[in-house]
Amino acid sequence: MPEEDVVDQKRYFEESCKPKCVKPLLEYQACVKRIQDDESGHKHCTGQYFDYWHCVDKCVSV
C-alpha cells in the first residue's frame, strides 16, 4: 500500500472531535494568552490543557 493512502486514524478521529470541544479549547487559549508574560514560570495552563484533551478523548471513545 502506498504511503499516501495511509491515514492516521487517531489523528482523523481527534480532528473530527475538535469542533465539539471548542469551549475548553478557547479556555486553554485564553489562559495561555493571560500568562504569556509571566516570567516567574509559576503560572501554567495544565488544567485547561487536560480539560481540552479530556473532551477530545471522550468524543473519540464514543
UniProtKB/Swiss-Prot annotation:
One of its GO terms (cellular component) is mitochondrial inner membrane. Disulfide bonds join 17-59, 31-45. Its main location: mitochondrion. The keyword Amino-acid biosynthesis does not apply. It comes from the Eukaryota. The keyword Ribosomal protein does not apply. It is found in: Mitochondrion inner membrane. InterPro entries: Cyt_b-c1_6, Ubol_cytC_Rdtase_hinge_dom, Ubol_cytC_Rdtase_hinge_dom_sf. One of its GO terms (biological process) is mitochondrial electron transport, ubiquinol to cytochrome c. It is a peripheral membrane protein. Keywords: Disulfide bond, Electron transport, Membrane, Mitochondrion, Mitochondrion inner membrane, Respiratory chain, Transport. Component of the ubiquinol-cytochrome c oxidoreductase (cytochrome b-c1 complex, complex III, CIII), a multisubunit enzyme composed of 10 subunits. The complex is composed of 3 respiratory subunits cytochrome b (MT-CYB), cytochrome c1 (CYC1-1 or CYC1-2) and Rieske protein (UCR1-1 or UCR1-2), 2 core protein subunits MPPalpha1 (or MPPalpha2) and MPPB, and 5 low-molecular weight protein subunits QCR7-1 (or QCR7-2), UCRQ-1 (or UCRQ-2), QCR9, UCRY and probably QCR6-1 (or QCR6-2). Component of the ubiquinol-cytochrome c oxidoreductase, a multisubunit transmembrane complex that is part of the mitochondrial electron transport chain which drives oxidative phosphorylation. PANTHER family: CYTOCHROME B-C1 COMPLEX SUBUNIT 6, MITOCHONDRIAL, UBIQUINOL-CYTOCHROME C REDUCTASE COMPLEX 7.8 KDA PROTEIN. Belongs to the UQCRH/QCR6 family. This is Cytochrome b-c1 complex subunit 6-2, mitochondrial.
